[in-house]
Amino acid sequence: MTWEKELSELKSRRKLVEKMGGEDNIKKHNERGKLTARERISRFVDKNSFEEIMPLVGESIYENDTQTSFTPKSSIDGFALVNDRRVALSAGDFTVKGGMGKGASSASAGLGQEKSITQEALINLIPYIRLLDSAGGSVRNFEKIGRTYLPDGNSFV
């Protein structure tokens, strides 16, 4: 038995994930003077140190056992080095559904058994960094209070 078909599909999905929300959405994002989530990560972390977790999570549509479309999750999560210190980080990908998730996040993938990036940071006792890009709320408010809001859910870092 050979795994060529399955390996080919994984490679294809990886290429689709790296295209984020597609060329048009990336172009619109850049025209607004904004960096994409992957560009922000690349500029923030030590060179070539980012290790994305669960990069193939997303929403696939199949017709007759053939994948016709794939939308990646709207959050890019992983581990990296910042000034040679290991950190966990998350960046909202605004090119995918305006940064809004639809249940296809690293925390909800795989029957809910995986730990979220915030839980991984807590377990490993490393800093957790969020690279925010928001459509709502006031960033000025975050500046004024000197922090962001506390995350919802069962994980608390």
Question: What do these predicted ranges mean?
Answer:
Residues 1-157:
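Terminal-region recognition feature
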